[in-house]
Each structure stands twice: as C-alpha cells, then as structure tokens.
Design a protein with these regions (language model features):
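N-terminal Rossmann-like or analogous alpha/beta NTP/dinucleotide-binding catalytic cores
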Residues: 2-158, 258-272, 316
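Active-site-adjacent bridging/hinge elements
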Residues: 27-35, 64-66, 235-239, 288-295
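Short, histidine-centered active-site or binding-site loop motifs used for metal coordination
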Residues: 39-43, 73-75, 240, 244, ...
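Structured loops at beta-to-helix junctions and adjacent beta-edge loops in soluble globular domains
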Residues: 40, 143, 195-197, 228, ...
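Acidic, glycine-rich active-site loops and adjacent beta-strand->loop/helix elements
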Residues: 73-79, 254-256, 281-284, 363
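Second-shell loop/turn segments in exported
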Residues: 76-78, 117, 250-252, 304-307
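Active-site cores that bind ATP or allylic diphosphates and position pyrophosphate for catalysis
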Residues: 139-279, 284-293, 303, 455-471
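Catalytic adenosine-cofactor/nucleotide-binding cores of aminoacyl-tRNA synthetases and other
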Residues: 270-455
Length: 472
C-alpha cells in the first residue's frame, strides 16, 4: 500500500532531509537577550517611509541587545518584481545608515552564514520542508484549477459564507494517496496545500509585543504553500526562513496582524519555535480631517527618495521617526542634546498602538535643530553635495568655498546657533542676498518702487509714528 512517504518522494524526489538544513544553520552564538531582527521587503519598487521606519526599529533593537539585523529579499512573486529594486533597497538603507549586519549587500550578493538571503535562491530548502509536511500528512497536492477555485468562491458568496479553501470546500484534502499518485503520474498539474488542523470556532490568544493580548479565531484555511512554479508562497517561506535564520522578533506592519493565527500554526506544525511578533501601527496622513495611511500613489513623502530630493538630512528623518516610535525620545533628546541617538534605549512595549500622524512641520523643525548643530564646513559639504545633484546654479556659486564658509559660519557654533536652514533646498533662498549673481537676478523680478510724492511719504511716516515710534 502506498503511503505519504511514497507521495512525498514522487513530488520531491531530490529534496534533502530537513536535518541537513537544521545542522547547516545552527543556533546563533549570541549573548543572552540578544534580539535578531530582519527587514524583508519585496523588490517591487521604491522603499516606503514605513519600510524605513520598520528597519530603523529593527536595526535599533538588534544594536542595543548585541543581536543581529539582516536584510532578506522576499522575491517569490516574480511577476511583480522591478529591475534593480534590490540595489535600490540596499542603497536606501545605506543612505540612512541603517546597515544590516548580514543579508543582501547588492543586487545579487549577500554576506553571512545563514544565506542565501534571497527567497528565489532558496527553492530547494522550501521543497525539503514541504516534503517533510507531506510525509507527516500535514500537506497535500491540490489539483484544483484556478477556475475550480473561482467556482468555489462564487458558491460561497452566493450562500453568504466565509470564502476560502477549508473544511468541506477543500476538495483535494480528501483525495487518497493512491489517487493523488495516479493523477500526478498521469501528468495532471498541481500545487501543494497545507492541511490546517484548525477550527474557526476555536480561539487562540496571542501576546503581541506592541499590541498586547490579541484574540483570534484559529486558522482553518488550507493555504497554498508551494505554487505551480515550485516557489513557495510568502507565508510558508517566512516560516521556514525565520526559523533557519533564527529571527527572534518579527517586526512588521500591522496589516499582517490577521496572519498571526496562520503563521503560528505553520511554525507549530513544522515543529519550530515561533518568534515574537511586534506589529507596528502605520504612519498616517491627515487628509482634510481624515486620517489615512501614507500612500505610495498619492503622497510624495511616502518615498524615501523624497527626503534626498528635498535635501532633508537622513539624520533628521531618523530623529523624527524615533520620536514617532517612542514618545519618550523627545524628552531624552532635550536632556541629551549632544548624545548620539544610538544611546537612546528604544522600548517596543512603549510604541503607540494607533498610527502616528506624519507631521512635516515637526520634521522640518527637527531638521533645523540637526542642521544648526553642524559646523560651517559640514553645512557647506552637505549643501554642495545636494546642489550638485539637484540645483546646478547653487552648486556653481558654492564653488568659492572660502566665501561660502564665511556665509555659513555667521552665528554658527555659539550657544544659540542660527536655525534658518531646515533643508538643503532652502539654502539658495537663505543666502541669495549674500551673492550678487542671485541678488541681481531677483532684483529684476522684484523691482523696487520709488515713492516720492509728498502725500504717500506723510502717510508712511504717520503710520510709523503711530505703530512703532516710542519716545523712550
């Protein structure tokens, strides 16, 4: 009689035993309490400010506990992939000095002992764990076509019941091993589904590091774990990767909160210890009185490239994001104006449960303070750097370094340094009266009106005396 093992061998004849990977990726040798975090974006476009926020928090927690922060690329959905997106992610993190200890360091290469760090290069690893689940009777081949699945959904909608592939609707769950083997040998195409042991009428209690106690119904969906192309789905890949890379804390946006029951179930059925989860509230925008998530489509400031274009220093953006992360940071910064942000202790359980509003005025205010602490030389280097990319005219006049340093040196480096620059794109406007070539150009644009009729002069003098003149 054919059994699960025969089925597993037919589907994945070349897959290794999972013990091979368990030995290849041993526990990390880290001090007690060390936190291992990751930033795991998909290479589908630019880095969103929310992604930067998550990485900043993940990097900080790893640093302050002598742990590890790594960059993993989740590229199993190859239809959505954008060319050179990985190097874009790597350089965005570099620009903000949020550098991973291991993981991807360019478009195709990674560093560290727990790689590959690109999911598309880990296909054989996922297949080994999928094979293991099939051997245990915890996963099965599903022969339903996309049309079959659509038909199931239509029936569920008509009957007004919960959509999905579960319970009586999971048609292939009950296909016998013999039948499955025959159908595969006949060349029928299939995917691999997880056989969920869950029941929707049972509750699970989960402790989220940020949100506290959360109750969910158990997962009962038989989700796809390996697609027709042999690559895993996000859910399955993340469970295998976070286990083998020994992630201790998964820090991610709270749009993933509803996946927790499924993820915990996958960890449990695979025999893994689950990581802790910390679900971060999104950064919101006030859109005419309505709070909504910052959106890649509608908001320029959602893309991290926006800050470089505007000339807002990376340091200022990080200070501002740390303010959003922990409200205690503001007082800490006031008490320690000259300390590095690295000395601040971030606490996950002090993070806000609801989304913070993105406040550009506040960010520019933080930025003014950051720039006010720079030396004339640093202001000059930064302004020139920015101008050479975004404003040729400014770059041209800054070529006279000696004069520029005098201009930037005015009221700088004393107890109350000037706070007139909030971003490098402000510089030209702030210094134009110090440069003939800029001032002359503006003089044509704003001609000075000469007033010489007696009536107007009397009117102005009278106004001055009433409003401003004080004999004392």
């Amino acid at each position: 009689k054919m059994d699960y093992k025969d089925l597993a061998n037919l589907i994945f004849p070349d897959a290794k035993e999972i013990s091979y990977y368990e030995e290849k990726y041993p526990e990390r040798d880290l001090p007690e309490g060390a936190i291992v975090t990751r930033f795991a974006p998909s290479p589908t476009g630019f880095v969103h400010i929310g992604g930067l926020y998550q990485s900043l928090i993940a990097r900080k927690l790893a640093s302050q506990t002598n742990g590890v922060f790594f960059l993993r690329v989740e590229d199993t959905d190859q239809k959505r992939e954008v060319e050179n997106a990985v190097s874009g992610i790597v350089s965005s993190l570099k620009d903000f000095a949020i550098e991973p200890d291991e993981g991807m360091i360019s478009e195709d290469e990674g560093k560290g002992n727990y790689g590959p760090y690109k999911q598309s290069q880990r296909k054989e690893i996922y297949q080994a764990y999928a094979k293991y689940l099939i051997e245990q009777g915890k996963a099965y081949p599903c022969f339903c076509t996309p049309e079959d699945v659509e038909e199931i959904r239509a029936k569920q909608e008509a009957a007004k019941i919960r959509p999905g592939y579960y319970g009586v609707w999971a048609k292939c769950r009950t296909v016998t091993v013999e039948d499955a083997i025959k159908r595969i040998q006949n060349g029928e195409s299939y995917i691999i589904r997880f056989k969920s042991p869950g029941r929707e009428d049972r509750k699970i209690q989960h402790h989220d590091v940020i949100k506290g106690k959360v109750d969910f119904p158990e997962n009962d969906q038989d989700i796809v774990i390996i697609k027709a192309d042999g690559l895993p789905t996000y859910h399955f890949a993340h469970a295998v990767d976070d286990h083998l890379m020994h992630t201790t804390h998964v820090i991610r946006g709270d749009e993933w909160l509803s996946s927790v029951p499924l993820h915990l179930q996958l960890f449990h059925e695979l025999g893994f210890k689950a990581p802790k989860y910390a679900h971060i509230a999104p950064i919101m925008k006030n859109d005419n009185g309505n709070k909504r998530k910052l959106s890649k489509r509608k908001d320029a400031e959602a893309a991290v490239s926006y800050y470089a274009e505007e000339g807002i220093p990376a340091e200022a953006v990080k200070e501002y994001l740390m303010n959003i992360a922990n409200s205690t940071f503001e007082n800490w910064r006031r008490a320690n104006p000259d300390k590095s942000m690295d000395e601040f202790q971030l606490q996950l359980n002090k993070m806000s449960v609801s989304g913070a509003l993105f406040d550009m005025v506040k960010l520019l205010d933080v930025s003014k303070t950051v720039i006010s602490k720079m030396t004339a030389e640093e202001v000059y280097e930064n302004a020139l750097n920015w101008a050479s990319k975004y404003d040729q005219e400014l770059a041209e006049i800054l070529k006279d370094k000696e004069y520029a340093l005098k201009v930037f040196g005015i009221e700088r480096g004393n107890k109350k340094p000037r706070k007139d620059i909030s971003k490098w794109s402000d510089v030209k406007e702030n210094v134009e009266y110090m440069y003939n070539e800029l001032f002359d150009k503006n003089e044509e644009e704003y001609p000075f009106q000469v007033i010489n009729d007696k009536e107007s002069i009397e009117k102005i003098l009278k106004l001055y005396v009433e409003k401003y003149y004080d004999e004392n």
